A protein has these predicted regions:
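Flexible, solvent-exposed loop/hinge segments and secondary-structure transition points
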Residues: 1-134, 138-157
């Protein structure tokens, strides 16, 4: 089994939150939210809840999603203006690993949710990595949905 670790969870959270101490949270995936996530991914999400971290306006999510045969682990940070950071933490396929490169990941910055919970922008694919690109885009859209739900539930400051 191929497993390439690009970034650890603590390093990803440090990159997103710098000197702030993010609050950890656990979001149950049920009811309408579970239906939205299933629609975004094109299949039901395996877990019943998702761990996340948040500060005042930013949430960070670490999500596993199947690429071709194996799951990849993606970290997505979302703020008031959309996606602020996207990292491939662990990649487990023999091909398509180019999705971890900065030129590809930068395309997601600033993307928000359009109607129907799709990404607001187009992503240029990578030849030979179509399934990994699609999986990354599904995770990005899922993180935007989850961020919206969490921010709506936080008490107003």
């Amino acid at each position: 089994e191929v497993q390439i670790r690009h970034l650890s969870q603590p390093d990803f959270l440090q990159q997103v939150f710098a000197d702030q101490q993010p609050q950890p949270g656990l979001l149950p995936l049920r009811g309408e939210l579970r239906e939205r996530v299933t629609k975004v991914l094109g299949h039901p999400y395996r877990g019943m809840r998702l761990r996340y971290w948040h500060s005042d306006e930013i949430s960070a999510w670490i999500i596993d999603e199947k690429s071709k045969d194996m799951p990849m682990t993606v970290g997505v940070a979302v703020g008031p203006t959309g996606i602020v950071d996207l990292e491939i933490l662990v990649y487990r396929e023999p091909r398509g690993g180019e999705v971890h490169q900065a030129f590809f990941r930068r395309q997601y910055r600033g993307m928000t949710l359009s109607e129907n919970d799709t990404l607001s922008g187009q992503v240029d694919g990578i030849t030979g990595a179509t399934l990994s690109v699609d999986a990354t885009s599904r995770v990005a859209a899922m993180a935007l949905v989850l961020h919206q739900v969490v921010m709506d539930r936080l008490p107003s400051r």
